[in-house]
């Protein structure tokens, strides 16, 4: 990977996009961004509050603007929100401006990784979280597949080993 190409991480919540993204950026000496953190920084409020006040559609529009802006930078690693792929325009930004890495994980791992996280506005009713995650997977997985240049399973590996695996795969394309 001679020149520093943008790397965009997509996948469901709990796949490890932020954690793996930080590892990748350190190992490749690239700047790291997290679209959710950027939205929080710009609004001065957490994602749950933005969802409550603006609804999911308002949040997604903010997210689309942030991703449009961030993907024009050079040599970055970007962890996107799980639902960022809902809009075609956002998928186009990602697929045309860098290498898209789809981090795959199981519903079981998602449940385990997100169960104590209060910053997940779509998972605020523990009784129905499995069904919510299954519905989101049904809706979003085709979009992740559509734009993925690389697919990596994250279930039983450390963030560091997933990052090394991604780097190895990047060298092949």
Curated annotation (Swiss-Prot):
Its cofactor is Mg(2+). One of its GO terms (molecular function) is ATP binding. Pathway: Metabolic intermediate biosynthesis; chorismate biosynthesis; chorismate from D-erythrose 4-phosphate and phosphoenolpyruvate: step 5/7. Binds 1 Mg(2+) ion per subunit. Its EC number is 2.7.1.71. InterPro entries: P-loop_NTPase, Shikimate/glucono_kinase, Shikimate_kinase/TSH1, Shikimate_kinase_CS. Substrate binds at residues 36, 60, 82, 140. ATP binds at residues 14-19, 120, 157. Catalyzes the specific phosphorylation of the 3-hydroxyl group of shikimic acid using ATP as a cosubstrate. PANTHER family: SHIKIMATE KINASE (PTHR21087), SHIKIMATE KINASE 1, CHLOROPLASTIC (PTHR21087:SF16). HAMAP family: Shikimate_kinase (MF_00109). This is Shikimate kinase.
């Amino acid at each position: 990977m001679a020149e520093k190409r943008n790397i965009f991480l997509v996948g469901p919540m709990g796949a490890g996009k932020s954690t793996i993204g930080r590892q990748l950026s350190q190992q490749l000496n690239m700047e790291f961004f997290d679209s959710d953190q950027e939205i929080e920084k710009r609004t001065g409020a957490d994602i749950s509050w933005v969802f409550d006040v603006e609804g999911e559609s308002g949040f997604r529009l903010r997210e689309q603007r942030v991703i449009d802006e961030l993907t024009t930078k050079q040599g970055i690693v970007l962890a996107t929100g799980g639902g960022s792929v809902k809009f075609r325009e956002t998928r186009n930004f990602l697929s045309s401006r860098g290498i898209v890495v789809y981090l795959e994980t199981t519903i079981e791992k998602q449940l385990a990784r997100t169960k104590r996280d209060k910053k997940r506005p779509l998972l605020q009713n523990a009784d129905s979280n499995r069904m919510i995650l299954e519905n989101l997977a049904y809706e979003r997985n085709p979009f992740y597949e559509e734009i993925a240049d690389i697919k990596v399973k994250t279930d039983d590996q450390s963030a560091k080993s997933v990052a090394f695996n991604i780097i190895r795969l990047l060298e092949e394309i």
